[in-house]
């Protein structure tokens, strides 16, 4: 009987040795002693709760959560265990779970002001996070990007000005593009795309310019991309053809073939009917453009030596002599 009576007294002394004050003094030593105690008494809810406190002081919040969960399984109405569970969840940045845990503990003990304090902390952080998300969403909506393709590349342009190269991170994988940009205003812009077709990551690059960020993704094959993004099985891609070269889909509802536009402009210039000096100048330009090296040398030499009064294409003539100044009959040449 004497031995039986000594058991509870010994257990009480052991429990007293694990008070919060003693744990504060040396949490690591207390952790080791509590682990030994739990080996002897694996169903002691209070030991788990106190060991969780050791984990909190040592910054091991996940281990703390595991211990308080075990403590609450053995004693669901342990307010201290709920408080410590919420603290661990808070430090693990699981603010929603922490808020729920603190609210549960407050229902059990409304006089403990610790629950009020931690509930307010969670609410402040959650409200702050919502504000940050709203600011980020505003940034995302302001910044636009365009894309176009050539036979060998798909090019994305981010319309972001005055960004330093060190503030830009771009990642390439076979079917994914990610970009993170630190905006001068202090907000971040992120872009993540699941690409329609594969790219060659190691041959893909980006360039930071004063007015934009240009991302060039290398195509493994000269195929035409019908769109930028896509998932799953895609139809057999079409081979890239000249009639779609350098089309800029952009954010507009139409595409423009810039090569075709340049060709049309050149054709208009070629067929433009000029009169007077303009027609004569165009004729000289055409002669010079189509001429041989000797013709070009003759035109340059005659024009320079004559002060612009003679233009000859006969190199065998002007190459042997200095071309004299010869103004038109009704004009007089003067040197200024």
From Swiss-Prot:
<feature type="repeat" description="TPR 3">
    <location>
        <begin position="79"/>
        <end position="112"/>
    </location>
</feature>
<dbReference type="InterPro" id="IPR007699">
    <property type="entry name" value="SGS_dom"/>
</dbReference>
<comment type="similarity">
    <text>Belongs to the SGT1 family.</text>
</comment>
<protein>
    <recommendedName>
        <fullName>Protein SGT1 homolog</fullName>
    </recommendedName>
</protein>
<dbReference type="InterPro" id="IPR019734">
    <property type="entry name" value="TPR_rpt"/>
</dbReference>
<dbReference type="InterPro" id="IPR044563">
    <property type="entry name" value="Sgt1-like"/>
</dbReference>
<dbReference type="Pfam" id="PF05002">
    <property type="entry name" value="SGS"/>
</dbReference>
<keyword id="KW-0677">Repeat</keyword>
<dbReference type="GO" id="GO:0005829">
    <property type="term" value="C:cytosol"/>
</dbReference>
<dbReference type="GO" id="GO:0007051">
    <property type="term" value="P:spindle organization"/>
</dbReference>
<keyword id="KW-0833">Ubl conjugation pathway</keyword>
<feature type="cross-link" description="Glycyl lysine isopeptide (Lys-Gly) (interchain with G-Cter in SUMO1); alternate">
    <location>
        <position position="266"/>
    </location>
</feature>
<dbReference type="GO" id="GO:0051382">
    <property type="term" value="P:kinetochore assembly"/>
</dbReference>
<keyword id="KW-0007">Acetylation</keyword>
<dbReference type="GO" id="GO:0051087">
    <property type="term" value="F:protein-folding chaperone binding"/>
</dbReference>
<dbReference type="GO" id="GO:0000776">
    <property type="term" value="C:kinetochore"/>
</dbReference>
<keyword id="KW-1017">Isopeptide bond</keyword>
<dbReference type="Pfam" id="PF04969">
    <property type="entry name" value="CS"/>
</dbReference>
<dbReference type="InterPro" id="IPR011990">
    <property type="entry name" value="TPR-like_helical_dom_sf"/>
</dbReference>
<keyword id="KW-0963">Cytoplasm</keyword>
<keyword id="KW-0832">Ubl conjugation</keyword>
<dbReference type="GO" id="GO:0106222">
    <property type="term" value="F:lncRNA binding"/>
</dbReference>
<feature type="repeat" description="TPR 1">
    <location>
        <begin position="11"/>
        <end position="44"/>
    </location>
</feature>
<feature type="domain" description="CS">
    <location>
        <begin position="140"/>
        <end position="229"/>
    </location>
</feature>
<feature type="modified residue" description="Phosphothreonine">
    <location>
        <position position="255"/>
    </location>
</feature>
<comment type="subunit">
    <text>Probably associates with SCF (SKP1-CUL1-F-box protein) complex through interaction with SKP1. Interacts with S100A6. Interacts with HSP90.</text>
</comment>
<feature type="modified residue" description="Phosphothreonine">
    <location>
        <position position="236"/>
    </location>
</feature>
<feature type="modified residue" description="Phosphoserine">
    <location>
        <position position="252"/>
    </location>
</feature>
<keyword id="KW-0802">TPR repeat</keyword>
<dbReference type="GO" id="GO:0014841">
    <property type="term" value="P:skeletal muscle satellite cell proliferation"/>
</dbReference>
<feature type="modified residue" description="Phosphoserine">
    <location>
        <position position="302"/>
    </location>
</feature>
<keyword id="KW-0539">Nucleus</keyword>
<dbReference type="GO" id="GO:0032991">
    <property type="term" value="C:protein-containing complex"/>
</dbReference>
<feature type="repeat" description="TPR 2">
    <location>
        <begin position="45"/>
        <end position="78"/>
    </location>
</feature>
<dbReference type="InterPro" id="IPR008978">
    <property type="entry name" value="HSP20-like_chaperone"/>
</dbReference>
<comment type="function">
    <text>May play a role in ubiquitination and subsequent proteasomal degradation of target proteins.</text>
</comment>
<dbReference type="GO" id="GO:0016604">
    <property type="term" value="C:nuclear body"/>
</dbReference>
<feature type="modified residue" description="N-acetylalanine">
    <location>
        <position position="2"/>
    </location>
</feature>
<dbReference type="InterPro" id="IPR007052">
    <property type="entry name" value="CS_dom"/>
</dbReference>
<feature type="cross-link" description="Glycyl lysine isopeptide (Lys-Gly) (interchain with G-Cter in SUMO2); alternate">
    <location>
        <position position="266"/>
    </location>
</feature>
<feature type="domain" description="SGS">
    <location>
        <begin position="247"/>
        <end position="336"/>
    </location>
</feature>
<keyword id="KW-0597">Phosphoprotein</keyword>
